[in-house]
Amino acid sequence: MDYAQSRLQARFGERPDDMLWQALEAVPERGVALEVARASGLRRWVAGISADADSHEIEIALRARWRECVTEISSWMPAGWQPATLWTSGLVDLPALCHLARGGRPLPWMFSDPLLQAYARADPMTRGRMLREDCGAFAGSSFAASGNAVLPAAPSPSSIRKAWLEEWRRRWPRWGDTGLLENLALLLDAALKQPAAIGRPELVRRLRSLFRRSVLRPVAAFIYIAFAALDMERLRTGLLKPALARDGIIAS
């Protein structure tokens, strides 16, 4: 874990502070926001995003950078931890999967996303069946039918969240010191279940506390990934606001 810890500490030190976020979010033009991001630790996230990209292109680019981030972090980890690390790439897919499970219409960018396009292109009934089968493949009894009960067309958002967390836990290698990892799992579950109940500042505070206690432990990688997800979400908001205004989706 020495190599992984040194890389994680370096990346953690590059994370934007409040002043940089304020500078990025204060600019009205996305081109300027991209310049601010490229001059900071956010530069990896905005690679490939042009000043004239529309909102859907921005979403696809950020999601691609996210998967690259998780893959890179996984490569730093001991082999036994790589399956669990790679599984976290699905963290940012959960809101989209829950949206589809509620019966929401696929958003335009979903048709271009490597993971979500199969769901987006399916008709509603097939989409629901696909969601249930894919969740059931790794959740086992959580999605099993009891007796002759008729299963709903799609799993509930809470079932998707639970199945994702169960599979993540299943991928943890045998390891005696799982206390901090369990604390992180509970924190992620609470944040995914009720995002408004745990505000961003409180979530960041708790993650920082866990990170300080995780030196040379595998959990440090997962805590950093959680930070990366928060940073991507905030960057997306900063970049999409002018793009959506330009596209006529929100008022400028």
Could you say what each language-model-derived stretch is?
Residues 1-252:
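N-terminal domain-start signal
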